Amino acid sequence: MKKPACIGRFAPTPSGYLHFGSLVAALASYLDARAADGQWLLRMEDLDPPREVAGAQAGILETLERYGFEWDGQMVRQSERHDAYAEILQRWFNHGLAYACTCSRKQLEGFQGIYPGFCRNAGHSPDNAAIRIRVPELEYRFDDRVQGTFKMHLGRESGDFVIRRRDGLYAYQLAVVIDDAWQGVTDIVRGADLLDSTPRQLYLQELLGLPQPRYLHVPLITQPDGHKLGKSYRSPPLPADQATPLLLRALRALGQPLDTHMADGTAQEVLAWGIRHWNADLIPRLRNIEEARID
């Protein structure tokens, strides 16, 4: 069977229920994949059990189904992928690419999130320590389909970053690179808050000899105070009975054409319309859009 030219994915975290910002990201990834006659995969990024909200995983699946989304194959849970992460982390540790870090948050205050390298050559045991990956003094750049060229000098703007936390939980940067490659994802469509994660992921892809996916970062939907809609800011979950109007609103946020008759359609009809008329070039070339400004 021929592999589809486009494989997209939606990868929510179960730290809360889906909200309007989640819907915009899910819709963009779904339409982009389906318009290319591609596959759309679903992955639950349940890497952080202490932050997981009881019932959120089931709620996310139910909401996606109510809003008409259909994914290909079985949903993948990152909590079931720890062996794959451990194998690669251990390989890097054995080859000196990764090292143990015992720095506390207090020690790192004042460095603006850029790791100063205190433990880089300390030779600490990995027990009861975070694991960091060594980064080169190089600039990584990529061409985003909406945001244009984005670049970051890993040494100056990131520093060696954590790939496994001190509590033993694997970091997002490691897991997402491994799983996107394992699932054959070719097109990553997600929120613009993850733009600065991408150069780190490009570096990990390089270390693993992986092909680079295409990237499209959609504008974040923000609150009046500038914070993105999100679970930590008590953004309201998507109501079960508002699929059609909220899908249409999400299409407007993405700059897509609308048919006035769609207001009376089902969620499935709105999605079908969106697939037929999808044009990523119409997505606003912005990092964020205030929710109140979406008509």
From Swiss-Prot:
Segments carrying motif 'KMSKS' region: 228-232
GO CC terms: cytosol
Origin: domain of life: Bacteria
Keywords: Aminoacyl-tRNA synthetase, ATP-binding, Ligase, Metal-binding, Nucleotide-binding, Zinc
InterPro entries: Glu-Q_tRNA(Asp)_Synthase, Glu/Gln-tRNA-synth, Glu/Gln-tRNA-synth_Ib_cat-dom, GluQ/Sye, Rossmann-like_a/b/a_fold
UniProt cofactor(s): Zn(2+)
EC number of this enzyme: 6.1.1.-
GO molecular function: ATP binding; glutamate-tRNA ligase activity; zinc ion binding
Signal peptide positions on this chain: none
Positions contributing to Zn(2+) binding: 101, 103, 115, 119
Example GO BP: tRNA modification
Residue numbers covered by motif 'HIGH' region: 12-22
Binding site for ATP: 231
Cofactor binding description: Binds 1 zinc ion per subunit.
Residue positions binding L-glutamate: 9-13, 45, 172, 190
Purpose of the protein: Catalyzes the tRNA-independent activation of glutamate in presence of ATP and the subsequent transfer of glutamate onto a tRNA(Asp). Glutamate is transferred on the 2-amino-5-(4,5-dihydroxy-2-cyclopenten-1-yl) moiety of the queuosine in the wobble position of the QUC anticodon.
Family membership noted in the UniProt record: Belongs to the class-I aminoacyl-tRNA synthetase family. GluQ subfamily.
Identification of the protein by name: Glutamyl-Q tRNA(Asp) synthetase
